[in-house]
Structures are given as structure tokens and as C-alpha cells.
Amino acid sequence: MTEKATAPGEGANDLSMAVLNAIQNPVILVDENGFVAFANWEAESFFGASANHLARHDISAFIPFGSPLLTLIEQVRERRAAVNEYRVDLSSPRLGADKLVDLYVAPVLSQPGSVVIVFQERSMADKIDRQLTHRAAARSVTGLASMLAHEIKNPLSGIRGAAQLLETSVNDEDRSLTRLICDETDRIVSLVDRMEVFSDERPVDRLPLNIHAVLDHVKAIAKAGFARRIKISEHYDPSLPPVFANRDQLVQVFLNLIKNAAEAIGDRADGEILLTTAYRPGIRLSVAGTREKISLPLEFCVHDNGPGVPPDLLPHLFDPFITTKTNGSGLGLALVAKIIGGHGGIVECDSQHSRTTFRVLMPASKGLAADEETPMTKGTNG
């Protein structure tokens, strides 16, 4: 039997490809004609196309018309020197909205005209900035809620009492007006009560939790009530380590997210909600002013096939009083952001037509195996 000979350099090429595929950033090689000569696995995911498909097209087919990336490529070819460009907008129907990236473009000296491009998505850093904005907004609601509880609820109780007294002495035609006064005061009191949740800054007990037990419990509540006609399925990572959190608050978070998904789906017959969990070890956040990095490897998602969130609303979705619901208060998602932020995590939303995903990223609990039960989770199956 004759063994296949290895061509000179073939082993080195295989090693180079293995190294490039191990990089967690999208990397592509563009040849002298502008065609994609190589794309690593992350680039396939980034562009939503296979390496073979990418290789049959000019790079301009995959980025927005007039993108500054094309200018950078020409600049690197002319100067034969690498450049860095920050916060380049590659937003497009193909790549999605809010696609900000940092770019590193370098010449391949052994192949004149060819350049290698490394993409570093800015989305995570920008999401952290938005989370800080959400927390500041929640703090402003906290102060407002404390003031409203004292300055508004007390007078409202007097107004409602007076309306009830009037109701006993007016004719039937005017009784509807006194009833309206009572109903509206009740509505305002209910709104203030919901806002008072923001002013509760008491420390909460946290324990290592099995997130799947929490999600199953929330699913059972949803199927018994508002989501009884909607298919809810799950795709869990069984090896997920525990999350260090307060169980009641996590139930509140995911009950809110699943209810939002159910309301978005409405009465459509093919409505479906998908719950997923995953371990993403590559997500690490820098802490301002220190060398510390926080790892947020636990990813919990609520997906739905509703109509999607309006693009103009998406950047403000977690701000207080933002809602598309006729009778909504706009406080549910703001509370979700406050709770998750208080646990050291972040929450984000990605929405396109017929597909919306709410993604919660949280730190893992230290010192417990993934399958170890805790007092908070033992025996909890929803």
C-alpha cells in the first residue's frame, strides 16, 4: 500500500487554518481582486454564509454600499501597512442592525494586493453602556416612586373617598362620573404601587440555583394561564453550572419575559416560545478603573416568533414608561433590567421580523458542579 505523500507546506497550511478557526473573532483574507480567499468559522457566522459561498463573491457583496471598509482595504494596499479603525458601522439587512465593529486590516506581504481583516464586534461594549443607562434610569424611577408614594397616594385616597360619598347622593346619570373617578384613582394607585418596586433597595438572599428548575417553574405558571394556547419548548444545556441569584427575582424576570413573548404572539395559531440555555465562556467584561474582568458565561434566552419590536423602539426598550401596549405601564422590562443588573448581569434584545430574542447573560456561581443540587433548587421541577 502506498501512503499519500504530503505536499511541502501542506501541514503548515492545515495548522494555520486550525489556528485561524480557533480565533473567536471573524477573520477573512481578501485577495488582490477583492474576492474572499479565506474565512474562518467565526466569519461564516458573522456574515451568515459558508466559506465556500463567501469565496465566490467580492467582499463588497457582503458589506453595506460605500462602506469605509473598502477605503481601508485600498489604503492598506497602497501603504503596505496595517491600520486600525474603530466603531465602523456595518449595519445592513444581511448583517443586522447596530452592527458596529472595530477593524484591523493588514497586508499579506507574501501575496501583494491581499489583505487580512479582523472584525471585533463593538456590540457587547455598547450593550454595557446601555445597561448603565438603564440602571441610571431605574435609580431615577426609584426616587420618583418614593416621592409619589407619599405625595400622590395619600391625596388619591381622599379623592376616592369623596367620590364614594358623592355616589350615594347623586342621580343615576351622574353616578357613572363618580364611578369613573374611583376607577381612575385605582389605576393611578396601581401604577404607583408598581413603581414602588424600584424603591426597594433591601439586600436579597442569593444562593446557587439550577436555572432549568426556575425556567420549568415559570413555564408551568405560563402554561396554566396566559400562555395556555402557545407552544413553549426548551433547548437546555444540561451541563450548565449554577447561577448565583435570588430565585424569586429570577422567576419575576422570566415570567415577565415569557409574558411579553406571549402577548407579542397574540392569537396566531403557529405561535411558539423557545427557552434556551448555553455556556458562553468567551464573554468577559472589563471593569472600569481596574484590571478586573467579569465573566458572564451563562446565557438564558427567550425566543418568540411574534411580529418583532419596532426598530425605533428597540434602543429604548428597557427604559421606564416605554411600551407599545394599550394599557401597559412600560415598567416591566425596566424592572427586568434593574434585577439582572443588580445580579451583575446584562439583558439585551435582538428583534427582526417574526423573530425576537431576549438574552440574559449572568455570572456563574463559584464552587459548585453543574449538576449539584442546592436547598433552593432541590425538588423544584415547576
Curated annotation (Swiss-Prot):
One of its GO terms (molecular function) is hydrolase activity. GO terms for cellular component: cytoplasm. SMART domains: HATPase_c (SM00387), HisKA (SM00388). Its main location: cytoplasm. The modification Phosphohistidine is found at residue 150. It comes from the Bacteria. Autophosphorylated. Member of the two-component regulatory system NtrB/NtrC, which controls expression of the nitrogen-regulated (ntr) genes in response to nitrogen limitation. Under conditions of nitrogen limitation, NtrB autophosphorylates and transfers the phosphoryl group to NtrC. In the presence of nitrogen, acts as a phosphatase that dephosphorylates and inactivates NtrC. PANTHER family: PEROXIDE STRESS-ACTIVATED HISTIDINE KINASE MAK3 (PTHR43065:SF10), SENSOR HISTIDINE KINASE (PTHR43065). This is Sensory histidine kinase/phosphatase NtrB.
